[in-house]
Amino acid sequence: MNDILLQWFGFVSMPRFFQQKNVLSIVFFILFASSSFSKEVRTISVIPVPMEYELQKGYFSIDSLTLFSDALSPKVKCVVDEKLAELGEEGYILDVTSGGISLKACSRAGLFYGKMTLRQLYADNKVPYVRIKDKPRFSHRGIMVDVSRHFFSKEEIKEMINWMSVYKLNRFHWHLTDDGGWRFEVEDYPELTKKTAFRSHHLWREWWKNGGKFVSVDEQGAAGGYYTKEDIKEIVEYAADRHITIIPEIEFPGHSREVFVAYPELCCAEKPYSGGTFCVGNDKTYAFMKSVLNTVMDLFPSEMVHIGGDETNTAAWKNCPKCRGLMTKENMKDIHELHNYIIGEAEKILKSRGRRMIGWDEIANEKRDKSSVIMSWRGEQAGIDAAKKGYDVILTPLHYLYLDYFQASPDKEPLAHDGYTPIEKVYTYRPIPDTLNDEAHAHILGIQGNIWTEWIPNMKHLEYMAFPRTLAVAEVAWSPEEKRSWKSFRNRLGSHIVKLQDAGVNTYKLSSDIESVVNVDTVRKKLEVLLKCEREDVEIRYTDNGLRPTRKSALYSRPLVVKDSLCVKAAAFKKGNIQGDIFTQHFYYHKGIGKKVQFSTRNKSGKILADGYIGGKTYLDGSWVNIHGDQEFIMDLGEEQEVRTVSTRWMQLRAGARRHLPQQVEILFSNDGENYFSGGIVRKKSLKDIPALQYQEYVFNGHWNARYIKMKVKAGDGGMSVDEIIVI
């Protein structure tokens, strides 16, 4: 196996793949012996799907050593042609005919990506006749990995970079510092790695629960690590060989608790473990910032440097004499202007050396220099607004592109952050809204998938969370929107998962479980229930009479219509056998749909409690109402009606932000909205004490006549999430 073959396939200097036990897997993977590539098909199983391609009948036969040799061959021609500038630096044209293989691009980057496509097309010593004209949709196609919460070795970072290059991702955002540990050397501040690169517990949650203390490297049980300058230079070069730019991130002014363990004088309290925010009024802060950022710029040649800027706790600034003094000196009216000030200082340092600053969307401010880049994470609106103002923007909205969120039902998956981003949701993300004009559109540089690692303690787990969702990110970032199709992507994905697994990657396997999507039609007073499964090689069968589905049950082929109530049980079947769990859900077009719901303890509408949509597997999906403390909410049915059942569903989650059940819920009824009578109290059940997602339904049965329904909620141990109020 010659070096150029390995280089083209992204496996240079990969110790993991050179272990003897993996040799067969390497050969199998590189030669693409998967049977799915041996079939006569009229499409190509390439990810990301090319901009244009025309598949012809027939194959060009060629052995791997000839195809991937660095020696000249009349059968394979790779040409850099400046006349192809219309395709940009990363575009290419690939022609496979009976006469041989021709690959053209206007740069070496374009040739590289063409070779990655050729790699995916090659199987069984042949390549299909095809003409491909391809270029990326976005210039920024990124993945972020947090190495502070859990440390990943140099070789593990290289492995991630390899797989990014295979799927034409070109930006590796390296989150190097945070509360969990400082991960690189700074000569002027040696205590950063001496005192805060190692900690008392490996697992983030155990470490945090036990006080979050850092230890020296020689202390028994010390966990963590850092990258030497030579490590970083090696990784930067390694990435550059694969046409990947590394964007380093150093957190300012928040998320910096670890810094003050090493240098407590840089925080307002001047004590270790006293907070996570730099003292903006302290001159030493800016000396530190300048030294660190200059070190970063010496190590990383990237045009852009990320300075964080997110989730800054400003409480310490309010009572800090130095911060107050700076506010007076600079005529600041608001404490938040201090945030703008310190971000501006970072911006100046970077600009002085010809670099551009990136920050999370909290830095978006009219005073910001237009050379700075906004990374929009709390949704899309901040990014859209910034693009309209002329800022360049990278979109990474958490509800679509956070790959540390659950990717399947939380009760069956490893612990994760509390969001829910299954691969279909990642894939169906539309980065450019229709409302964005062409001028603003040009400021959207691209997208990025983020992998925060509070719940990801090792490389096997990182692989599981990253793959195959990273492939979805890659196709959204590269392929034209009109060429993208979830059905097509899902059909292509299976063979790629097999190849990743053959190469030793611990991928997530597409779920066999059934999920539902509900459309509410308030005009026709009905629900339409769509059933779906991630796997494409199964059929869905269901019952609507409460019985367990079998291979003889109705085959799902169109949305189910609900005009009153319907109990659906469904399952995925393959060759007559059930795959995964049986899906069970009651659907109601109930009396409360479309009715007014008002919180009596705060001036807020509870519209989504009566919209007919059932909450999903995350309290962040827009169908749950998230509340704190005792609450009351009142539904107005519009007129007196007979009511026999009122129910609500509540969430318990012992991971991430945590959701708690209310201690009790009381139901009350009224006809005039003033005089209420109680219909009963339901108290919290003792659910399993496990981190996984669980639910409790608070159900009230009886026979009442009323116009108004009030629910009095007695708070649990923290934040609560309530689903639809169902009235029957």
Each model region followed by its residue ranges:
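Feature activates predominantly on carbohydrate-active enzymes
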Residues: 45, 64, 89-287, 292-304, ...
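Surface-exposed loop/turn motifs at beta-strand-loop junctions within extracellular Ig-like
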Residues: 107, 572-576, 715
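Bacterial Sec-dependent N-terminal signal peptides
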Residues: 1-43
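Active-site neighborhood of glycoside hydrolase catalytic domains
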Residues: 259, 265-370, 377-380, 384-385
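Acidic, contiguous N-terminal accessory segments
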Residues: 29, 36-141, 353-360, 364, ...
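Aromatic, loop-rich ligand-recognition surfaces of beta-strand-rich domains
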Residues: 617-680, 692-728
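Short, compositionally stereotyped local motifs that mark structural "simplifiers"
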Residues: 38, 480, 484-635, 642
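Flexible, acidic glycine-rich loops studded with aromatic residues
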Residues: 357-362, 367-372, 378-527
